[in-house]
């Protein structure tokens, strides 16, 4: 299956050659990849000009984005705002061969809520328009993980927590990430173990596997950099992700060896087909969210 071959090449980081005369195969690949988050990664490996011409976001654009984000981080540090970058930005910046390999649309930045005064001072000093949403955090219906979403050269999503709940704004995963972080290529990021946990949490619990196969590649890249298995095991257990991690590792290893089971093959194809799609049947969580918004609408 084409989806299996695409994902295997990306995981193995192998160049991909296609017969320039094989128009049907080229069309099939570009059709599959056109909305996929791993499209640039595959296209950067591809030797076919016909396929490479379909890559809308190239290396230079991501290099510029990363320079801008590093400048934002520097200014946050100058204001002594504790922060770490999560999700796409650190992965693009430090875990992939080319920055453009890992597509992201927003820069997700987790900040320490204890520094909220200094954070808003940073926003005002840099003329970044905001709504001072901090004043809404105690509202019953306020369930968003992002404190401020600011449209600049790169969309900046400033988060106060990683996991979402209808209770308080407390988040153990966020506390771990702000406490156990390192600096990679000039950006503060959670430890590899926490970054992997966040990746798995978002894929399974937040996105319900609708984010596609990118979480498999992210996980493989993080693990390749090195993780402390004992520490990782403890964190995964805390967030009920142990079994999902084991299944993910098994899937990646089998796929790289070319011994994936039929069940795994069907699962991967499903990831490709369902990326970005919404379920017709809303989850209990989505229903509860909508009810909460009716009773106490978000203030913006």
Please identify what each model-predicted range represents.
Residues 1-105, 111-300:
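Conserved NTP-donor binding/palm subdomain of two-metal-ion nucleotidyltransferases/polymerases, i.e.
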